[in-house]
A protein has these predicted regions:
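Acidic/glycine-rich phosphate/pyrophosphate-binding loops and surrounding catalytic core
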Residues: 9, 127-129
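Non-DNA-binding regulatory cores of transcription-related proteins
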Residues: 66-68, 76-125
């Protein structure tokens, strides 16, 4: 089975992530989804993906749900590792960031080498580069996580 390239300009997402996230957003936000910037960003990425692929075809350098993502601050070089999770598992103290939080929404669907502009609690935006994905479920054969 051939892996997809993650370099597509329109992006690539997992069909499983798309299905689960669209249902989650519809169920929890309904018409209010347009007023939440993080939710809007995730929906935009889901709807504008150039490729929606079966989990086993997802390239290992793509940020998918339940991935561990290594970020590097483009100015200071500071390293930050986060785990991209569903809202019910959001726990910043454990480095678990919901895909529907600005941190998670900023990295979802990006690839190693891409940049994400992430605001802190005070609204100051820092540019982070996706430096690596130490764990991605699809790359390890966990195709239903």
């Amino acid at each position: 089975m051939q892996m997809l390239s993650s370099g597509s300009p329109a992006g690539c997402i997992s069909a499983l992530d798309q299905e689960r996230l669209e249902a989650l957003i519809e169920r929890n936000f309904g018409e209010a989804q347009r007023v939440n910037p993080a939710v809007s960003a995730v929906l935009k990425r889901l709807r504008n993906a150039g490729v929606v692929a079966r989990p086993e075809l997802i390239p290992p350098g793509l940020v998918t749900m339940n991935s561990t993502v290594r970020l590097v601050d483009s100015e200071s070089g500071r390293v930050w590792e986060i785990i991209l999770v569903y809202p019910e598992d959001h726990d910043p103290a454990e480095s678990c960031w919901s895909v529907l939080h600005p941190v998670g929404a900023a990295v979802f669907g990006l690839c190693v080498g891409d940049f994400a502009d992430i605001p802190d609690e005070s609204g100051v935006v820092t540019r982070w580069q996706i430096a690596g994905i130490p764990f991605q479920p699809e790359a390890r054969g966990f195709l239903t996580m």
